[in-house]
């Protein structure tokens, strides 16, 4: 038992009492108290009581306001079929005997059931039985039109937008930011999901209460951790994942295998937490692989599936009588679910499959209905004609479903009435601020990532500076400058490839958070760009300072500043391009392969290896799409734009030809002969090639260096927009 001390705004104790586990929801506390201080007198996780500001408990005349609002979730005849590719055989090669190359596979076949608030419904079965598919169907994560059947809450069909607000879905994998502490992780979830109108102190209060409810107080200040950083345990990670999705105290909670990969003790602790959440007034529906005896004692309803069919549906207590009636009684002192799953696997491997068990379950369900005609209906409420809209509103008034907000709302017609459903808890700029702060905090605790990238850029710049040290104004110097610029500009893009795994690592976090409107996709895209940009500035300055003066580039201070700008623009467009690809490709290795290949094509068509005028017409479009082309042409113009600078004088005319091996005297005589032949006096000091001539020879004549800079920056914005469209169209998080 724990003792909760409730205080007023002046921190003066005004009421103190011991709290029992049957008290009301945590959400109620947010509206009615200012602070909560826990004094441990045991190891039981505290549950909070509901108090008025004057310190008295709300009872008596107001008791009907606090009476639990009943919810019953029912699903009937859920059927889900998918088309799968069929293996080709010899007959498919014969035109007149060719059949369809796909066949229909049934993942769910007329699945029905129901559960209510305060209960845990567990879906069991072997791998491939349809557990996760059923959870996805109930959570509206299957595309509309693909799923047949109905899902209702209190007898009324659930609209997609309504379900988003009143429910939460916990994925099987614990995808969390590794360098955030448990407390920070839950606090960011509170900032995303709880309304802006709720003071930050109340949000902190909600987080602290949730930490106690999840039983992770000792790990509150510990980072989540990953392979390279020691953090919390697997069971604690799972409870944090659950906490993120129940921060707003949802009415319905879906979980996909919450005990997967955990030892028996950790699994029991997780389900024990779920039981507390259910007792606070939530409906818990989860899939589970093979629960232990202790876990089974916490479950209220079970559904066993076998290849999409229901083979058992009922309470755990009815398992022995069910299998005894089927002719396979469960031995004493044996785990009932293990016995049931072993029997189902054995039947699946037999000739008749589980058809007999499916039919027996149907008869057994009919016998139950005949012996007990009372269906699962809500108990009497203050208003027996309470609609779903009114029930949800009443639940919100009790403190359940702490969400809503200032970010705009949509009105849903439901059951003859309307209910304002908030689209987002926060306005656009608050989302950007919070997302940016979270990313910076997570990245700041991993300085080695920026350090390694900065070291790579500096080392690359140092190698280039020493290889192309102090280039002179000669024909060879011109060719070496061209090689330096081509390699340097392509390096800007290749070093951006490390941005690829960033979003791929965050993909499922992003999908989980946006699935329930934690924030807008546009907010994420802008925040991602804001967090990325400062590091690009450091990288640009590091490379520019390392190479500009060492290589001996022209232009002075203004030339250096433009050199910095075009490098920054190259980093920006390269980072945006790789970020866009990260929203398209599903795997890191595939992404790296695509990035390397496309950047190689960009370099090929940049104009360094082959001039624009010599590129075949059917490939010229790739030249204009090349990201390397524009920064390459910009630095060429920055270097060769001075009309007084000469790069080929007199006898240097022969340097890039076999005649370059001749002695200086022979070159002078040859130059004199050339002068007489063309009728023009050419001395050893005559300028034959200026910077403008070099640009013309390279085909750099269409755009100014500032236009090239703007186009490079524009490419960066274009790929950010394309990244947003990928997130908008490709992250619906639904099966088809």
Swiss-Prot record:
Topology of this chain in the membrane: Multi-pass membrane protein
Domain of life from the UniProt record: Eukaryota
Transmembrane regions: 410-430, 449-469, 484-504, 525-545, 569-589, 590-610, 709-729
Compartments where located: Membrane
MF terms (GO), sorted A to Z: ABC-type transporter activity; ATP binding; ATP hydrolysis activity
Keywords, alphabetical: ATP-binding, Membrane, Nucleotide-binding, Transmembrane, Transmembrane helix, Transport
Gene Ontology annotations for the cellular component aspect, listed alphabetically: membrane
InterPro entries listed in its UniProt record: AAA+_ATPase (IPR003593), ABC2_TM (IPR013525), ABC_transporter-like_ATP-bd (IPR003439), ABC_transporter-like_CS (IPR017871), ABCG_transporters (IPR050352), P-loop_NTPase (IPR027417)
Gene Ontology biological process terms from the UniProt entry: pollen wall assembly
Annotated ranges, domain ABC transporter: 88-332
Domain ABC transmembrane type-2: start-end pairs: 430-640
Family annotation (PROSITE patterns): ABC_TRANSPORTER_1, ABC_TRANSPORTER_2
Residues annotated as binding ATP: 125-132
Family of the protein in this entry: Belongs to the ABC transporter superfamily. ABCG family. Eye pigment precursor importer (TC 3.A.1.204) subfamily.
PANTHER family tied to this protein: ABC TRANSPORTER G FAMILY MEMBER 16, ABC TRANSPORTER G FAMILY MEMBER 28
Protein name: ABC transporter G family member 16
Gene (UniProt): ABCG16
């Amino acid at each position: 038992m724990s003792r909760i001390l409730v205080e007023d705004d002046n921190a003066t104790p005004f009421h103190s009492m011991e709290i029992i586990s049957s008290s009301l929801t945590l959400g109620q506390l947010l509206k009615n108290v200012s602070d909560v201080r826990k004094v441990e007198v045991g190891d039981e996780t505290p549950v909070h009581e509901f108090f008025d500001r004057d310190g008295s408990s709300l009872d008596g005349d107001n008791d009907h306001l606090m009476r639990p609002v009943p919810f019953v979730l029912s699903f009937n005849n859920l059927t889900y079929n998918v088309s799968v590719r069929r293996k080709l055989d010899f007959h498919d090669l014969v035109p007149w005997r060719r059949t369809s190359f796909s066949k229909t596979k049934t993942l769910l076949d007329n699945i029905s059931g129901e559960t209510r608030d305060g209960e845990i419904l567990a879906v069991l079965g072997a791998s491939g039985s349809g557990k996760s598919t059923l959870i996805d169907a109930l959570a509206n994560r299957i595309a509309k039109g693909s799923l047949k059947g109905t899902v209702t809450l209190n007898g009324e069909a659930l609209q997609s937008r309504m379900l988003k607000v009143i429910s939460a879905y916990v994925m099987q994998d614990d995808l969390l930011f590794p360098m955030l502490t448990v407390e920070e992780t839950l606090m960011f979830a509170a900032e995303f999901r709880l309304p802006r109108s709720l003071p930050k102190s109340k949000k902190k209060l909600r987080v602290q209460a949730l930490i106690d409810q999840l039983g992770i107080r000792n790990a509150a200040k510990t980072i989540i951790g990953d392979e390279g950083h020691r953090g919390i345990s697997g069971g604690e990670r799972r409870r944090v994942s659950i906490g993120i999705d129940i921060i707003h105290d949802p009415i319905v909670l879906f979980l996909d295998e919450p005990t997967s990969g955990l030892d028996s003790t950790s699994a029991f602790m997780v389900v024990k937490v779920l039981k507390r959440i259910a007792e606070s007034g939530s409906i818990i529906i989860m899939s589970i692989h093979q629960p232990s005896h202790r876990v089974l004692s916490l479950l209220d309803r079970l559904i066993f599936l076998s290849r999409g069919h229901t083979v058992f549906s009922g309470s755990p207590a009815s398992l022995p009588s069910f299998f005894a009636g089927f002719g396979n009684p469960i031995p004493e002192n044996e785990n009932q679910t293990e016995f049931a799953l072993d029997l189902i696997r054995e039947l699946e491997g037999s000739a008749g499959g589980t058809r007999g068990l499916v039919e027996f379950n149907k008869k057994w369900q009919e016998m139950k209905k005949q012996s007990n005609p009372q269906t699962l209906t809500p108990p009497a409420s203050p208003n027996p004609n309470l609609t779903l809209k009114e029930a949800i509103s009443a639940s919100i008034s009790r403190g359940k479903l702490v969400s809503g907000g200032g970010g705009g709302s949509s009105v849903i017609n439901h059951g003859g009435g309307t209910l304002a459903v908030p689209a987002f808890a926060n306005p656009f700029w608050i989302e950007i601020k919070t997302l940016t702060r979270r990313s910076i905090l997570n990245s700041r605790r991993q300085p080695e990532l920026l350090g390694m990238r900065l070291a790579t850029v500096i080392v690359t710049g140092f190698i280039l500076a020493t290889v192309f040290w102090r280039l002179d104004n000669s024909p060879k110097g011109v060719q070496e400058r061209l090689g330096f610029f081509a390699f340097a500009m392509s390096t800007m893009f290749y070093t951006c490839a490390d941005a690829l795994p960033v979003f791929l690592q965050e993909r499922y976090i992003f999908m989980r958070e946006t699935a329930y409107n934690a924030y807008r996709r546009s907010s994420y895209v802008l925040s991602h760009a804001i967090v990325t940009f400062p590091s690009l500035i450091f990288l640009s300055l590091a490379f520019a300072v390392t190479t500009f003066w060492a290589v001996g580039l022209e232009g002075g201070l203004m030339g250096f500043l433009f050199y910095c700008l075009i490098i920054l623009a190259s980093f920006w467009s390269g980072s945006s391009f790789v970020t866009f690809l990260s929203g398209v490709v599903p795997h890191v290795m595939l992404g790296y392969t695509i990035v390397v290949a496309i950047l190689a094509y960009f370099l090929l068509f940049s104009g360094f290896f082959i001039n624009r005028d010599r590129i075949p017409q059917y490939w010229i479009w790739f030249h204009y799409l090349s990201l390397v082309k524009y920064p390459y042409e910009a630095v060429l113009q920055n270097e060769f734009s001075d009309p007084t600078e000469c790069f080929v004088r007199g006898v240097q005319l022969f340097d890039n030809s076999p005649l370059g091996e001749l002695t200086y005297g022979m070159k002078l005589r040859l130059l004199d002969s050339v002068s007489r032949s063309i009728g023009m006096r050419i001395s050893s000091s005559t300028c034959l090639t200026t910077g403008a001539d070099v640009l013309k020879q390279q085909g750099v004549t269409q755009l100014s260096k500032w236009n090239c800079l703007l186009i490079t920056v524009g490419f960066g914005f274009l790929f950010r927009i394309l990244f947003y469209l990928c997130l908008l169209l490709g992250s619906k998080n639904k099966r088809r």
